[in-house]
Amino acid sequence: MKRFLLSALVALGVVSASAQSYLVDNPANRAYFGIRVGGEVTCPGKITGGPVGIKFFNNGGGVEFGGIYNIPVVANFYVEPGLKLYYNTYSVKKDWVDLFQDDIVLDGVSVRKFGMRVPVMAGYHFDFTRDVRLHLFTGPELEVGFSGKEHISGKNIDMSSSIYGDDGNMNRVDVLWGAGVGLAYDHFYFGVSGSFGLCNMYNDSSVKFHENRVTFSLGYNF
């Protein structure tokens, strides 16, 4: 009986040590590709000039689609570059739309953007089992706008104009800092992240405006 109990305790110790090892240093780590699709809440910041700031835009929404490549570095630490396409929108608050009206009755003014994102995340995953992993990650993200339109709609008016270039007042390129958490089960992935704009998106240095967002992602890892 004592020999049986001793064997059981040894076996439990081996299992416990193995589980702890996988939790922070899984020897089965390997590089892999993954696809990601996400829905996002766009959170434009205040427009500020000196000490004065105004909330000019409502929050909006958007989608993104792309891929990642997860590269193990040491233990369960990894680097994960990616490439994604996005489309998102946000609108001018109704109080400001009403203020701009003159002879034209406006229903709304919105910003619509399409472009590319290149995130480079650094993270660590905790492997609770062979199939269940919790990811914590953070890092920079380059965002380049291919197309951006200010759309005005109202009674007897429906028009769009570019927000970039000589006729626009916004910059195409932004750098954001992101952080988030993800849960992987087998090959499937779900994550939530926030990204905070670091660059002034107005091309007038006397005015400051930053774009932020929250993203909910689904994915598959190969």
For the regions a protein language model found, what residue spans apply to each?
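Outer-envelope beta-barrel architecture signal
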Residues: 27-35, 75-79, 112-114, 130-134, ...
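Extracellular/periplasm-exposed beta-strand and loop segments of Gram-negative cell-envelope proteins
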Residues: 42-59, 88-115, 143-178, 200-211
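Cleavable N-terminal export/targeting peptides
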Residues: 1-29
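Short glycine/proline- and aromatic-enriched beta-strand/turn motifs that initiate or cap beta-hairpins
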Residues: 20-66
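Structural signature of Gram-negative outer-membrane beta-barrels, strongest in the C-terminal barrel
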Residues: 109-125, 129-149
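Residues on the lipid-exposed face of transmembrane beta-strands in outer-membrane beta-barrel proteins
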Residues: 35-39, 63-73, 83-85, 118-124, ...
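Local alpha-helix boundary/kink/capping signal
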Residues: 14-17, 87, 125, 146
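C-terminal/domain-terminus segments
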Residues: 192-221
